[in-house]
Amino acid sequence: RKTTNFLHLGSFFATLTILFFLCYSYVKTSHAPSSALGWLLLDHSDITETEENPFFLILSSLCGLMFSVYFGAYFFHRHPGTLNEASGVLIAFKTFSFLAILFYSFNHNTLFFFIMNGLVVILSIFTYFIFSLIFSQMRCPLFFRLVPVTCFIYSLFSFFVLALIPLANPSTIQVAGNLLDMLFIVSLGVFMWQRKKKQNKKHFEA
Protein backbone atom coordinates (compact mmCIF):
# COMPACT_ATOMS: atom_id res chain seq x y z
CA ARG A 1 0.00 0.00 0.00
CA LYS A 2 2.78 2.42 0.95
CA THR A 3 4.80 1.73 -2.20
CA THR A 4 1.68 2.22 -4.33
CA ASN A 5 1.22 5.65 -2.76
CA PHE A 6 4.86 6.48 -3.53
CA LEU A 7 4.30 5.39 -7.13
CA HIS A 8 1.17 7.50 -7.59
CA LEU A 9 2.61 10.56 -5.85
CA GLY A 10 5.81 10.28 -7.87
CA SER A 11 3.81 10.15 -11.10
CA PHE A 12 1.70 13.11 -9.94
CA PHE A 13 4.70 15.31 -9.19
CA ALA A 14 6.45 14.25 -12.40
CA THR A 15 3.40 15.45 -14.34
CA LEU A 16 3.30 18.74 -12.42
CA THR A 17 7.02 19.27 -13.04
CA ILE A 18 6.47 19.17 -16.78
CA LEU A 19 3.25 21.21 -16.74
CA PHE A 20 4.73 24.01 -14.62
CA PHE A 21 7.82 24.17 -16.81
CA LEU A 22 5.66 24.42 -19.92
CA CYS A 23 3.75 27.26 -18.23
CA TYR A 24 7.05 28.97 -17.42
CA SER A 25 8.22 28.62 -21.01
CA TYR A 26 4.93 30.03 -22.27
CA VAL A 27 4.88 33.16 -20.05
CA LYS A 28 8.63 33.82 -20.16
CA THR A 29 9.32 37.05 -22.02
CA SER A 30 12.83 38.03 -20.92
CA HIS A 31 16.25 36.71 -21.94
CA ALA A 32 16.88 35.45 -18.39
CA PRO A 33 18.68 32.10 -18.30
CA SER A 34 16.42 29.17 -17.48
CA SER A 35 18.92 26.66 -16.11
CA ALA A 36 21.88 26.40 -13.76
CA LEU A 37 24.19 26.11 -16.75
CA GLY A 38 22.99 29.43 -18.11
CA TRP A 39 23.19 31.10 -14.71
CA LEU A 40 26.73 29.80 -14.32
CA LEU A 41 28.18 30.76 -17.70
CA LEU A 42 26.10 33.65 -19.05
CA ASP A 43 26.02 37.31 -18.08
CA HIS A 44 22.63 38.08 -16.55
CA SER A 45 23.57 40.98 -14.26
CA ASP A 46 21.36 43.42 -16.18
CA ILE A 47 18.16 41.43 -15.68
CA THR A 48 15.72 42.95 -13.21
CA GLU A 49 13.35 41.06 -10.93
CA THR A 50 10.32 42.12 -12.98
CA GLU A 51 11.80 40.52 -16.10
CA GLU A 52 12.50 37.18 -14.50
CA ASN A 53 9.01 35.89 -13.57
CA PRO A 54 10.40 32.68 -12.00
CA PHE A 55 7.18 31.59 -10.25
CA PHE A 56 6.38 28.64 -12.52
CA LEU A 57 10.06 27.68 -12.67
CA ILE A 58 10.15 27.52 -8.86
CA LEU A 59 7.03 25.35 -8.80
CA SER A 60 8.44 23.08 -11.50
CA SER A 61 11.69 22.67 -9.60
CA LEU A 62 9.86 22.00 -6.32
CA CYS A 63 7.73 19.32 -7.97
CA GLY A 64 10.88 17.83 -9.51
CA LEU A 65 12.37 17.63 -6.01
CA MET A 66 9.22 15.95 -4.67
CA PHE A 67 9.30 13.48 -7.56
CA SER A 68 12.91 12.55 -6.77
CA VAL A 69 11.99 11.95 -3.11
CA TYR A 70 9.08 9.65 -3.98
CA PHE A 71 11.13 7.92 -6.67
CA GLY A 72 13.83 7.17 -4.09
CA ALA A 73 11.26 6.12 -1.47
CA TYR A 74 9.55 3.76 -3.90
CA PHE A 75 12.72 1.90 -4.81
CA PHE A 76 13.99 1.95 -1.22
CA HIS A 77 10.87 0.13 0.00
CA ARG A 78 9.95 -1.89 -3.08
CA HIS A 79 13.39 -2.84 -4.44
CA PRO A 80 15.95 -2.28 -1.65
CA GLY A 81 19.49 -1.79 -2.91
CA THR A 82 18.51 -1.50 -6.57
CA LEU A 83 18.79 2.25 -7.03
CA ASN A 84 19.63 3.58 -3.56
CA GLU A 85 22.84 5.39 -4.54
CA ALA A 86 21.43 6.74 -7.79
CA SER A 87 18.28 7.93 -6.01
CA GLY A 88 20.40 9.72 -3.43
CA VAL A 89 22.31 11.53 -6.17
CA LEU A 90 19.03 12.43 -7.91
CA ILE A 91 17.59 13.87 -4.70
CA ALA A 92 20.76 15.90 -4.10
CA PHE A 93 20.65 17.18 -7.69
CA LYS A 94 17.01 18.26 -7.45
CA THR A 95 17.50 19.76 -3.98
CA PHE A 96 20.36 22.00 -5.05
CA SER A 97 18.53 22.85 -8.29
CA PHE A 98 15.57 24.07 -6.25
CA LEU A 99 17.80 26.07 -3.90
CA ALA A 100 19.61 27.63 -6.86
CA ILE A 101 16.32 28.79 -8.36
CA LEU A 102 15.25 30.28 -5.03
CA PHE A 103 18.54 32.17 -4.72
CA TYR A 104 18.17 33.34 -8.31
CA SER A 105 14.78 34.79 -7.43
CA PHE A 106 16.19 36.86 -4.56
CA ASN A 107 19.82 37.63 -5.35
CA HIS A 108 21.65 36.18 -8.35
CA ASN A 109 24.75 38.36 -8.23
CA THR A 110 26.66 36.66 -5.43
CA LEU A 111 29.61 34.29 -5.30
CA PHE A 112 27.50 31.80 -3.35
CA PHE A 113 24.96 31.67 -6.18
CA PHE A 114 27.78 31.08 -8.67
CA ILE A 115 29.16 28.21 -6.56
CA MET A 116 25.66 26.75 -6.10
CA ASN A 117 25.07 26.63 -9.84
CA GLY A 118 28.46 25.08 -10.43
CA LEU A 119 27.48 22.32 -8.00
CA VAL A 120 24.13 21.84 -9.76
CA VAL A 121 25.83 21.49 -13.14
CA ILE A 122 28.27 18.91 -11.75
CA LEU A 123 25.46 16.98 -10.04
CA SER A 124 23.35 16.98 -13.19
CA ILE A 125 26.15 15.50 -15.27
CA PHE A 126 26.92 12.92 -12.57
CA THR A 127 23.22 12.03 -12.18
CA TYR A 128 22.80 11.31 -15.88
CA PHE A 129 26.04 9.33 -15.90
CA ILE A 130 25.19 7.12 -12.91
CA PHE A 131 21.67 6.35 -14.19
CA SER A 132 22.99 5.49 -17.65
CA LEU A 133 25.53 3.17 -16.02
CA ILE A 134 23.02 1.48 -13.72
CA PHE A 135 20.36 1.06 -16.41
CA SER A 136 22.98 -0.54 -18.65
CA GLN A 137 24.01 -2.91 -15.86
CA MET A 138 20.35 -3.79 -15.23
CA ARG A 139 19.90 -4.53 -18.96
CA CYS A 140 16.89 -2.23 -19.12
CA PRO A 141 15.02 -1.66 -22.40
CA LEU A 142 16.75 0.62 -24.89
CA PHE A 143 14.57 3.66 -24.07
CA PHE A 144 15.64 3.72 -20.41
CA ARG A 145 19.31 3.34 -21.32
CA LEU A 146 19.22 5.86 -24.15
CA VAL A 147 17.60 8.79 -22.29
CA PRO A 148 20.22 9.26 -19.52
CA VAL A 149 23.06 8.69 -22.00
CA THR A 150 21.62 11.38 -24.28
CA CYS A 151 21.19 13.77 -21.33
CA PHE A 152 24.75 13.08 -20.18
CA ILE A 153 26.30 13.70 -23.60
CA TYR A 154 24.22 16.82 -24.19
CA SER A 155 25.10 18.23 -20.75
CA LEU A 156 28.80 17.94 -21.50
CA PHE A 157 28.29 19.30 -25.01
CA SER A 158 26.25 22.32 -23.90
CA PHE A 159 28.69 23.10 -21.08
CA PHE A 160 31.64 23.31 -23.45
CA VAL A 161 29.64 25.19 -26.08
CA LEU A 162 28.45 27.87 -23.65
CA ALA A 163 31.87 28.09 -22.03
CA LEU A 164 33.99 28.21 -25.18
CA ILE A 165 31.72 29.57 -27.93
CA PRO A 166 30.02 32.74 -26.70
CA LEU A 167 28.42 33.37 -30.10
CA ALA A 168 26.29 30.23 -29.85
CA ASN A 169 22.58 30.74 -29.18
CA PRO A 170 22.36 30.23 -25.40
CA SER A 171 18.56 30.26 -25.28
CA THR A 172 18.19 27.33 -27.69
CA ILE A 173 20.90 25.35 -25.91
CA GLN A 174 19.25 25.84 -22.51
CA VAL A 175 15.74 25.04 -23.76
CA ALA A 176 16.99 21.80 -25.30
CA GLY A 177 18.73 20.94 -22.03
CA ASN A 178 15.56 21.65 -20.04
CA LEU A 179 13.47 19.53 -22.39
CA LEU A 180 15.92 16.65 -22.04
CA ASP A 181 15.68 16.97 -18.26
CA MET A 182 11.88 16.72 -18.57
CA LEU A 183 12.34 13.63 -20.76
CA PHE A 184 14.63 12.17 -18.11
CA ILE A 185 11.94 12.64 -15.46
CA VAL A 186 9.36 11.05 -17.76
CA SER A 187 11.65 8.06 -18.30
CA LEU A 188 12.11 7.60 -14.54
CA GLY A 189 8.35 7.81 -13.99
CA VAL A 190 7.71 5.22 -16.70
CA PHE A 191 10.51 3.08 -15.24
CA MET A 192 8.71 3.03 -11.87
CA TRP A 193 5.53 1.72 -13.51
CA GLN A 194 7.48 -0.76 -15.61
CA ARG A 195 9.14 -2.22 -12.51
CA LYS A 196 5.79 -2.43 -10.73
CA LYS A 197 4.22 -4.22 -13.70
CA LYS A 198 7.14 -6.65 -13.82
CA GLN A 199 6.90 -7.29 -10.07
CA ASN A 200 3.14 -7.89 -10.27
CA LYS A 201 3.65 -10.31 -13.16
CA LYS A 202 6.17 -12.33 -11.13
CA HIS A 203 3.80 -12.33 -8.15
CA PHE A 204 0.90 -13.50 -10.34
CA GLU A 205 2.95 -16.30 -11.92
CA ALA A 206 4.13 -17.45 -8.49
Name these PLM-found stretches.
Residues 201, 205-206:
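Non-transmembrane, juxtamembrane loop and terminal tail segments
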Residues 1-200:
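Hydrophobic, aromatic-enriched alpha-helical segments typical of multi-pass transmembrane helices
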